[in-house]
Curated annotation (Swiss-Prot):
It comes from Caenorhabditis briggsae. It is found in: Endoplasmic reticulum membrane. The chain crosses the membrane at residues 3-21, 36-53, 62-80, 97-110, 118-137, 150-168, 179-199. Residues 1-2, 54-61, 111-117, 169-178 are lumenal. PANTHER family: ER LUMEN PROTEIN RETAINING RECEPTOR. It is a multi-pass membrane protein. Coiled coil: none annotated. GO terms for biological process: protein retention in ER lumen; protein transport; vesicle-mediated transport. Belongs to the ERD2 family. InterPro entries: ER_ret_rcpt. GO terms for cellular component: cis-Golgi network; endoplasmic reticulum; endoplasmic reticulum membrane. The keyword Transmembrane applies. This is ER lumen protein-retaining receptor. Required for the retention of luminal endoplasmic reticulum proteins. Determines the specificity of the luminal ER protein retention system. Also required for normal vesicular traffic through the Golgi.
Amino acid sequence: MNIFRITADLAHAVAIVILLLKIWKSRSCEGISGRSQILFAVTFFTRYLDLFTSFYSLYNTVMKVLFLAGSIGTVYLMWVKFKATYDRNNDTFRIEFLVIPSIILALIINHEFMFMEVMWTFSIYLEAVAIMPQLFMLSRTGNAETITAHYLFALGSYRFLYIFNWVYRYYTESFFDPIAVVAGIVQTVLYADFFYLYITRVIQSNRQFEMSA
């Protein structure tokens, strides 16, 4: 079993749990970008279209269900149950600037021009940039609750750890997927400034997370 993939998936699962608990216990989705959460839900819906048509392993199926259910649950809590607490004034990133290029790229650059493959490729491109509305929202508000920072760190760690998974698979299986690798690197780079601030301010100084001016 690939320990790097398992660790990355666990980091992703932890991020989802942190976010859901944060919203449920505080009865508020303040500080969370509803637009990013919609993009994540679209990402996993289009990536896991094969959930009911293909079976690879129990682990794979459980993770697919967890990520999909977690994303849908988060969208429900933010846009339905606790919508009165959603900060629409600061969550203003134009997501069509992310969705449309992802669609175009998926149609042009893919492994095979078939519906399921194009949808999978689209999900990879979209996930790479889905965090941008959240980071944009942080830049507008200037700070975030510590629990929100923990969520974002766990989410960023998941993608960072997947880089080690790809390196491991390359050396053990001679497997290399340039689409997933390039998109993953782009996604990790987007988190770089956040990682630095998280480690220096939240972890080392035990302060509230604040974006630099």
